[in-house]
UniProtKB/Swiss-Prot annotation:
Keywords in alphabetical order: GTP-binding, Hydrolase, Membrane, Mitochondrion, Mitochondrion inner membrane, Nucleotide-binding, Protein biosynthesis, Transit peptide
Top enzyme category: hydrolase
EC number(s) on file: 3.6.5.-
Secretion signal span: none
NCBIfam families: lepA (TIGR01393), small_GTP (TIGR00231)
Topology with respect to the bilayer: Peripheral membrane protein
Subcellular location: Mitochondrion inner membrane
Record: transit peptide: 1-26
A GO term for molecular function: mitochondrial ribosome binding
Name of the protein: Translation factor GUF1 homolog, mitochondrial
Domain of life: Eukaryota
Residues binding GTP, per UniProt: 60-67, 121-125, 175-178
Family: Belongs to the TRAFAC class translation factor GTPase superfamily. Classic translation factor GTPase family. LepA subfamily.
Length: 651
């Protein structure tokens, strides 16, 4: 693919940026000198003008070796010592190390052949496509990594098109060529057919053994373009990542497009129009190291006077306070992926609510695709309704909490009647329905409903096509594309309602294909749908925690399931408990059942003596008990244990 190289202006007139290094090594010339002197080494970042900078990322399907390749880069460039490295050095989250996947985009600065290489490691799981898109905004090219034993997978295709549409230079790399199961000719053929790569463009490596790593680093220097920046222009940088440090506050990752940013400088955000002082400037190698300045084309981090976790907005443009705002050309804001799944989260201990609240808002700083709303449950107390990108995304920030069954966002379009709109809906024509409590009280007000859709890409063996097609059709799917990659592999695209796949669709998909399938899904807007409100009543009181919004064809089965579970979970009371499921506010039951009351057998106290006044005493007791239970039914509430809520809400 042709690369247009930008002219490389020299660096501006900032005092030298110095990096103080302890026992950290970069490329071999530095390594030898440091080993001889065993002293702190000063690195001048001003020695790296834009023509000596390469900002790149690694993208691939999950488990194709991105993190392992990043580890080898760090070792070969001397950023870490081989004897002391831990695997997956850029993976910091617990779920990343447990599952061997990358969730958050991580950055690291390395030095090779007198060039500064800024690596942005990216996730490969379908739930984290926003992380990939976000990291690509800071790069000028990517390494498209494909495992030789698995070939091109669904996420490989999605990542290729993300990079291609962003105009990035792409270097194809085939990993795991040392495995016995590797089929390199087949993978080369797939990359030719799908992406139009020439065999001569493809690099062959084994990240595990370190084979071919030097060739990849050389290709990054020789084949990727330098950043297109203006060193002598006023400061213009954009925020592409952020996270929260307990002792420092928000840490902001920036890519400097124009000018220089330095410690002590006062900066302003373009979109939120807030002013801050830069307290620390640094780069990641892979840990945080402080420098004096970041120059045009370089990537690093900032610590500023930002106090709130909401101040560091992803995609924000930073500029110097002395510059006129109307002279600044802002970078385009990065639009986060709309949450696909909503779930309510409650602390298992009510005393941990404040700690959970703080943790969630710190989470939102680092991941703007997460949405947070306050929630309250009669049984579970105060909590939060969270919008996530997917199931694994939910697990990413799991803690000692109760998570309810996930649901999707529906929308109700209200009839174009200004009186109704102003009186009941504050003038809003489209109402978001995140749970049963949001459902309009008057169904006659609704013109139609909308449900979220996804575009699902599947790569699977031709032997499983019939079973997979049946599964997708049952999920109300519509096939969009069907292409054969080779004699054994086929790529299908489906358009599906997300409500049909957000629960166990992918588990069933893997089961019917024996695991030989990969998938990627993308947000694909809304379309008209037929949905209903399944309302659960206990003793004629609506219980919104158990009620759900769902497609009409699923209502009956789900109603039976919930009523059955409630009968099993709710303990017997001193009075009758009636459970029923209805459509919306209708009084007609779809499914209903009764939990019989606990009986108090006082006839034993009469010792079988019903003669004389015994029978009168017996009838008197029955009358008192009946009146007492009626009074309890009117004044009291059904006691539903917390465990019952958890067991019913979890599917």
């Amino acid at each position: 693919m042709a690369v247009t190289r930008a002219a490389a202006p020299m660096v501006g007139n900032c005092s030298s940026a110095m990096l103080i290094i302890g026992r950290r090594y970069f490329s071999s010339p530095f390594t030898e000198k440091l080993r001889k002197t065993n002293r702190k080494k000063v690195i001048d970042l001003a020695a790296y003008p834009p023509k000596k900078i390469r900002n790149f990322g690694i993208v691939a399907h999950v488990d194709h070796g991105k993190s392992t390749l990043a580890d080898r880069f760090l070792e070969m460039t001397g950023a870490v010592e081989k004897s002391s490295h831990a695997s997956q050095m850029l993976d910091k989250l617990q779920v990343e190390r447990e599952r061997g996947i990358t969730v958050k985009a991580q950055s690291c600065t390395m030095f090779h052949k007198d060039c500064m290489l800024n690596l942005i490691d990216t996730p490969g799981h379908a739930d984290f496509s926003f992380e990939v898109a976000r990291s690509l905004t800071a790069t000028n090219g990517i390494l498209l990594l494909v495992a030789a034993n698995q070939g091109v997978q669904a996420q490989t295709v999605a990542n290729f098109w993300l990079a291609f549409e962003a105009g990035l230079t792409i270097i194809p790399v085939i990993n795991k060529v040392d495995l016995k199961s590797a089929n390199v000719p087949r993978v080369v053929s797939q990359m030719e057919n799908l992406f139009d790569f020439l065999p001569s463009e493809i690099l062959y490596i084994s990240a595990k053994n370190g084979t071919g790593i030097g060739d990849v680093l050389d290709a990054v220097v020789e084949r990727l373009p330098p950043p297109k920046v203006e060193a002598h222009s006023p400061l213009r940088a954009h925020v592409f990542d952020s996270w929260y440090e307990t002792h420092h506050g928000p840490v902001v990752c920036v890519a400097v497009h124009d000018g220089v940013i330095s410690k002590g400088q006062r900066i302003r955000t373009y979109h939120s129009d807030c002013e801050y002082e830069v307290l620390v400037v640094g780069i990641m190698i892979p840990n945080m190291y402080e420098v004096k300045c970041l120059y045009a084309g370089q990537v690093g981090y900032l610590l500023t006077t930002m106090k709130s976790v909401q101040d560091a907005v992803i995609g924000e443009t930073l500029y110097d306070v002395s510059d006129e705002r109307n002279m600044v050309q802002p970078m385009p804001l990065i639009t986060p992926t709309p949450p696909c799944i909503y779930a309510s989260i409650y602390p298992t201990n009510i005393n941990e609510y404040n700690a959970l609240r703080v943790a969630l808002y710190k989470l939102a700083l680092n991941d703007s695709s997460v949405q947070i709303q306050h929630s309250n449950s009669t049984a579970l107390g105060n909590g939060f309704k969270i919008g996530f990108s997917g199931h694994l995304h939910m697990e990413e920030y799991d803690a000692n909490i109760t998570i309810t069954a996930p649901s999707v966002e529906y929308r109700a379009v209200i009839k174009d009647n200004q009186t109704i709109l102003k009186k009941r809906y504050n003038g809003q024509r489209v109402i978001r329905l995140l749970d049963a409590s949001d459902f309009p009280v008057c169904p006659s007000d609704i013109d139609h409903f909308l449900e979220p859709m996804i575009k699902l890409t599947l790569l699977l063996s031709t032997a499983y096509c019939e079973h997979v097609e049946r599964l997708c059709v049952d999920a109300r799917g519509e096939q969009v594309e069907n292409n054969g990659l080779d004699t054994d592999c086929i790529m299908q695209q489906w358009r599906l309602p997300f409500a049909e796949v957000c629960m166990d669709f992918f588990d069933r998909l893997k089961r019917i294909t024996s695991g030989y399938v990969t998938y990627n899904y993308q947000w694909d807007g809304f379309q008209k749908a037929t949905i209903e409100l399944l309302m659960i009543h206990i003793n004629d009181l609506p219980i919104y925690e158990f009620s759900e919004i769902m497609p009409s064809n699923q209502i009956k089965a789900r109603a039976k399931e919930i009523v059955k579970k409630l009968k099993e979970e709710i303990p017997r009371q001193q009075y009758e408990v009636r459970i029923k499921a209805t459509l919306g506010q209708s009084k007609k039951a779809l499914v209903q059942t009764v939990i019989a009351p606990v009986k108090k057998d006082f006839t034993g106290r009469l010792k079988g003596n019903f003669g004389g006044s015994g029978w009168e005493r017996f009838c008197k007791k029955l009358s008192h008990q009946k009146k007492g239970k009626e009074r309890m039914k009117q004044l009291g509430q059904v006691q539903i244990p917390k465990e019952a809520f958890i067991n019913v809400l979890r599917r």
